[in-house]
Curated annotation (Swiss-Prot):
A single GO molecular function term of this UniProt record: structural molecule activity
Taxonomy, superkingdom: Viruses
Keywords: Capsid protein, Helical capsid protein, Ribonucleoprotein, Virion
Keyword Magnesium included in the entry's annotation: no
Residue ranges the record marks as coiled coil: none
Region feature (Disordered): 1-28
Record protein name field: Coat protein
Source organism (scientific name): Potato aucuba mosaic virus
Family matches, as Pfam families: Flexi_CP
Gene Ontology CC: helical viral capsid; ribonucleoprotein complex
Localisation: Virion
Family (UniProt): Belongs to the potexvirus capsid protein family.
Role: Required for genome encapsidation. Forms ribonucleoprotein complexes along with TGB1 helicase and viral RNA.
Amino acid sequence: MVDSKKTETPQVVDASKKAENSKTSQAGRIQFLSAPKQFSASDVRSSPSLADLDEIAYEVRTTSIASPAEIEAVCQLWIRNTEIPADKVALIAIDMARAYADVGASRKAVLLDAPTLAPTVARSRLAQLKAGAGISPRQFCSYYAKIVWNLMLHKNEPPANWAKIGFKEDYKFAAFDFFDAVDSPAALEPSQWVRHPTDKERAAHGVVKWASLSRERLQEGTSITTVAELNKGHLGGYNNLPALMAPPS
């Protein structure tokens, strides 16, 4: 008796051809995905590749830190108007920033003595000339923050007033008011580091800075008049440190 059902012949598929077709298809998809539109610098909607971004020569700048050109202008003022040796001017600039670390980098700061490399030129005179370049002591010092940090560690000489302003001994090297510029890419980079600041040193500086600003706010007070009957003769705040605001989270 003959089976009426049609016998199906199995199809033999070449495994090597199947794998080759799969690879070809996959390669085509990869090529399609990795071929973005060509970047056009005249089209603001065009997205640049990493290679395109290499054309941008950006210099990190911030208004809180003097630029190399501004520091150079200060040094030229010193050379033209004083007897400092031109071949030592960079070291004298660092000496000035180190002196500000002891007394505070503000226009009210009184700089003492003279740099050892220019013993006939008072630091106070150099500070006056620096003001003529249009940059503040804080901007000037912040440029050298990393160098000053290195110098103090290298010589084991912390800022003079570290205990007076409330730092513990473990964090005393962070006790200068332009310390936050040590982490800024806009500050002059040392050729080598003694060490980088620790997180605890950063935190200690932040807390003491916050406390100092709070003290100033309390001393300023909230009075809007000088009439003695109203302010009872007080010109500053009535509260002391326990009344400080909560520290920032």
